[in-house]
Amino acid sequence: MERWNINDSSKIYNLDNWGADLFSINKKGNVCVHPSPSSKSSIDLRVLVDDLIKRKIKPPILLRFMDVLQGRIASINRAFKSAISENDYPAKYQTFFPIKVNQQRQVVEAIASYGKRYNIGLEVGSKPELVAGISISSGNNLPIICNGYKDSEYIETVLYATAIGYDITLVIEKLFELEKVIELVKKTGIQPRLGIRVKLSSKGTGKWATSGGEDAKFGLRMSEIIAAIDLLEENGLLDRVKLIHFHIGSQITKIDKIKTALIEGARVYTELRKMGMGIEFVDIGGGLGVDYDGSKSSYFSSVNYSVEEYANDVIYQIKNICDDAGVECPNIISESGRATVAHYSVLVTNVLNTNTQRLTPDFEEELAAAEKLAPTVKKLVDIHKSIDRYSLREDYHDTVQLIQEAVSLFNLGYLTLNERAMAEWLYGKIIKKINSIVEKIKPIPEELQNFQLALRQTYFANFSLFQSIPDSWAIDQLFPIVPIQRLNQKPDVIASIADITCDSDGEITSFVGENGRTKFLPLHKIRKDEDYYIGFFLIGAYQEILGDMHNLFGDTNAVHITFNKKTGYMIDTVINGDACWESLKYVQYKGPEILKRVREHLEKGVAQRKVSIEESSHFIELLDRTLLGYTYLGE
């Protein structure tokens, strides 16, 4: 029997490369989470999940590791502190967290708390986010930057927040916004703190490249900046502009694109300073990416640079341009939301079932006893008997052709149902035999690599793809997926992951593998009377807020966890997932009204003696219990 150890598992899931030293596999074969890359302390995910289930917290469970979040904030700030020191940069760096990346109150409050020592700020892009930002800032005195489209109410709220002492900057995205600002400044007499968003020619890379460039949704072109300056000067507001902002897209995969944007943005800054504007801050926006697949490449699910390289380039490029222009260096702001929160949350859920055909009949005896077989079936029998590594390619192609032929013959009425079933059974036997041969061949012939798809099983997991990792469906984003136990054993199944929605799109067929993107996930056969859990990693950015309620599957249970030296971990907060009545309420159904209508219907049935009183009572109890229960599946 082939030996297998946890290092082998780490390789096939590429865990060491995407895990950022925050995830590992222990001697038991379970995935562990570390509070920081340098920490030897860890939490065993399988033990944690078992403990949560004992506490009646059912899967799917979103695990939020607050120490990891704190560590990510620290690592970004540490990288910039080091870059400032190495480059003798004369100004400061400040992190702003864009609330849109993860708007959950407890998460934003934690970021505000952990980020105090770094003077962290919040970036908001809508009226609800503005209100949330003001609320969080009220207890923490956090600075706020306001981006996005703005109406008069938005602008007036910012003005009055400024008047009563909030540190808040209103960024002008369009000229018509500036006209509204001027109008409201005259009306209220309140002097704002302003910023200007610049539309750079530079573009990012990957899925969000269109966020930058001449056709970008936001920002002022150079000619519009000149017009804005004239308008500001005419109305006595030019000295209120303290910041310029640019953003060339999220998850920028190539560092050279970042450098190009920094040079262009810094040139705009120096020119505006030469024109007499008192700009103090350059907000370089987001874009600091996450290496989701561990390839350290420019592929859209990876990045070809580190946080340290990013920080160094930001500081160096801006300083270099400013020194050449003889202009004072600005304070630098970045909005690195994805890199801050992606790693800290993990979704864990149980596998409910697989599509393994446990009741498939064995046709061995029937085939042996048959006096005459359909020609197609006979050819498949012959291939199965004779196949070896030297006839592999030809036999594989013949097998594919014959199974297609069997389907056509069945549809035309020339094969019976039993004969088609025999053909399918033989096809499966041949593919398994091919697999056993191919596993010993290195490298695998290219034309045979896809044959494994025929062996791929479907593992049905207790979650909604659309609710918990919508980017996997919407933009084909890769997220690392790993079973959290039995990693000291060799996986014996290749699988796809299907959710429990009634939608054929609710299936994951692209995974992070040892050599990049792969079409199957290695898993273990499900043992009887054993729970098997799968973890979805690096899902802390955008997924929670983008998740939708397809089939009315609601928010999952969420648990906030911190490390504890004595007990291993502490549960800080448990946030119950949506009950059925809560999901129904989103679409205007009310629990009491549902019960009332059903009860009235049942009473008519009782009166007509179609339903017994006991049946009516039991059904109402069952319905009531369902309304109060979790939207996801139990036993």
Curated annotation (Swiss-Prot):
Q: What does this protein do?
A: Catalyzes the biosynthesis of agmatine from arginine.
Alphabetical list of HAMAP family matching this protein: SpeA
- Highest taxon of source: Bacteria
Pathway per its UniProt entry is: Amine and polyamine biosynthesis; agmatine biosynthesis; agmatine from L-arginine: step 1/1
Q: Which residues bind substrate?
A: V282, D283, I284, G285, G286, G287, L288, G289, V290, D291, Y292
Look up the record and give one Gene Ontology term from the biological process aspect. arginine catabolic process
Q: Pfam families from the xrefs?
A: Arg_decarb_HB (PF17810), Arg_decarbox_C (PF17944), Orn_Arg_deC_N (PF02784)
Q: What is its EC number?
A: 4.1.1.19
Q: Which family is this sequence assigned to?
A: Belongs to the Orn/Lys/Arg decarboxylase class-II family. SpeA subfamily.
| Cofactor(s) demanded | Mg(2+); pyridoxal 5'-phosphate
What's a single GO MF annotation on this record?
Answer: arginine decarboxylase activity
Q: List the disulfide bonds.
A: none
Q: Give residues where N6-(pyridoxal phosphate)lysine occurs.
A: K100
Record key words, sorted: Decarboxylase, Lyase, Magnesium, Metal-binding, Polyamine biosynthesis, Pyridoxal phosphate, Spermidine biosynthesis
Q: Which reaction does it catalyse?
A: L-arginine + H(+) = agmatine + CO2
Kindly provide the name given to this protein in its UniProt entry.
Biosynthetic arginine decarboxylase
